[in-house]
Amino acid sequence: MQKHYHKLISYLCDFLEKETQKRGFKKVVYGLSGGLDSAVVGVLSQKVFKENAHALLMPSLVSMPESKSDALDLCETFSIPYTEYSIAPYDAIFCSYFKDASLTRKGNFCSRLRMAFLYDYSLKSNSLVIGTSNKSERMLGYGTLFGDLACAINPIGELFKTEVYELAQHLNIPKKILDKPPSADLFVGQSDEKDLGYPYSVIDPLLKDIEALFRTKPIHLETLTQLGYDETLVKNTISRIQKNAFKLELPTIAKRFDPK
């Protein structure tokens, strides 16, 4: 297992280096939240680009204090250059304009605001934006379109959350980041498990079987329940995948009109 992850780390570092060079960049930038996924991307990026890998810390009005402190500790431990841009003032303006906005609207606004800061920094510093969404999130559509899902390249987009966790252990990510419950930190009390209804340890095996069995054909509930999965889990997961599939697609462009 140790050898497998040594090869995976080498593969992902090679991916980052080649794909960044292919696009004509020498520097990268990414959002560092204090969570597991961005910590893994941050350490991988630092391995490849050293001081040319820059992290942006972008706390909102409702970001947990430990999110920022964990991100800062990671930067210190791995010598990661960073800049902090508080999005709290913009968050406050949105909330003052839209007093009845749901938690989802507020969270999506903050997610897209962070991506705006990342792409502004990208332009200013000629850096490529690196994504931090894992495969579990991508399959379930558990992310904000043109927010945290937006990026130029993503080294962990084909790793399920449980695989990212194992990779993080081999990268020596601090224990307090490893141990904290996964959360997008978009509103007080949020956690991935509360939003999704199940922990990733339960969801990921199902997602792996769905990908293996139904990559090119419709998903069948009966096939999955026969494998021993709980019917409610399967129904909820299939619903999320189908409902949010559009988030992984490029915009559909109308074909050129021919008046003849």
UniProtKB/Swiss-Prot annotation:
Q: Which Pfam families match?
A: NAD_synthase
Tell whether rRNA-binding is among the UniProt keywords: no
Enzyme Commission code: 6.3.1.5
Residues binding Mg(2+) are 37, 137
Q: Which is one GO molecular function term here?
A: glutaminase activity
Q: Which reaction does it catalyse?
A: deamido-NAD(+) + NH4(+) + ATP = AMP + diphosphate + NAD(+) + H(+)
Entry's InterPro entries? NAD/GMP_synthase, NAD_synthase, NH(3)-dep_NAD(+)_synth, Rossmann-like_a/b/a_fold
Q: Name one GO cellular component term.
A: cytoplasm
Q: Which pathway is this protein engaged in?
A: Cofactor biosynthesis; NAD(+) biosynthesis; NAD(+) from deamido-NAD(+) (ammonia route): step 1/1
Sites where the protein binds deamido-NAD(+): 112
Give the residues the record marks as binding ATP. 31-38, 132, 161, 183
**Listed GO biological process terms:** NAD biosynthetic process
First-tier enzyme category under EC:
ligase
Q: Which SUPFAM superfamilies match?
A: Adenine nucleotide alpha hydrolases-like
Could you tell me the keywords of this UniProt record? ATP-binding, Ligase, Magnesium, Metal-binding, NAD, Nucleotide-binding
The signal peptide, as residue positions, is none
Subunit-structure text: Homodimer.
The family note in this entry says: Belongs to the NAD synthetase family.
Biological role stated in the UniProt entry: Catalyzes the ATP-dependent amidation of deamido-NAD to form NAD. Uses ammonia as a nitrogen source.
Q: What is this protein called?
A: NH(3)-dependent NAD(+) synthetase
Q: Which organism is it from?
A: Helicobacter acinonychis (strain Sheeba)
Q: What is the lineage of its organism?
A: Bacteria, Pseudomonadati, Campylobacterota, Epsilonproteobacteria, Campylobacterales
